């Protein structure tokens, strides 16, 4: 009887283990239902200015038909989101942003001359479905302390 119970327990344990190993949605490439983008930001390399330029890598899934990006001061973005809402702001980025011509699995961009705190929003579109991703970049702001002509003596 004890052998029978042990074998039955082993069969139940094996069955429970096998049935618990189901594939979760979104883990297999090509099964996504909505467009998606992941934004990676890097320090810009020469000849760009690493203090005020940012390099971005955009990773798109296979459902993306078109993509747009908009870089603006973080305070301006916050005020627009407060008045328009998230969906309205995504529409704003699509209509006023820059269209990314080549939507490959990975696309690289370099944004230049960014002084202060910026929010970079990327919106991806598939039909009437939209998804956005945001990254922030803070570029150095320079302020003149003294104006005038400087003379240096060489000895």
Name these PLM-found stretches.
Residues 2, 15-46, 140-153:
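Bacterial Sec-dependent N-terminal signal peptides
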Residues 45-57, 103-107:
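Ser/Thr- and Asn-enriched, surface-exposed coil loops between beta-strands
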Residues 91-101:
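Extended, solvent-exposed segments with strong compositional bias
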Residues 100-103, 108-117:
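Surface-exposed, short loops/turns at beta-strand junctions within beta-sandwich domains
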Residues 112-131:
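Beta-strand-rich modules
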Residues 131-139:
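Edge beta-strands of extracellular beta-sandwich domains
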């Amino acid at each position: 009887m004890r052998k029978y119970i042990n074998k039955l327990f082993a069969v139940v344990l094996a069955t429970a283990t096998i049935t618990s190993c189901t594939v979760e949605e979104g883990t297999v490439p090509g099964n996504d239902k909505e467009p998606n983008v992941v934004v990676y930001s890097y320090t810009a390399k020469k000849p760009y200015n690493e203090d005020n330029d940012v390099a971005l890598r955009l990773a798109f899934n296979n459902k993306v038909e078109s993509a747009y990006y908009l870089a603006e001061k973080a305070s301006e973005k916050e005020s627009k989101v407060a008045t328009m809402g998230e969906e309205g702001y995504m529409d704003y980025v699509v209509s006023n942003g820059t269209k990314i011509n080549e939507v490959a699995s990975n696309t690289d961009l370099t944004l230049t001359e960014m002084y202060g705190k910026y929010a970079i929003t990327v919106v991806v579109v598939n039909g009437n479905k939209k998804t956005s991703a945001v990254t922030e970049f803070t570029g150095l702001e320079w302020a003149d302390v003294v104006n005038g002509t400087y003379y240096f003596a060489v000895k």
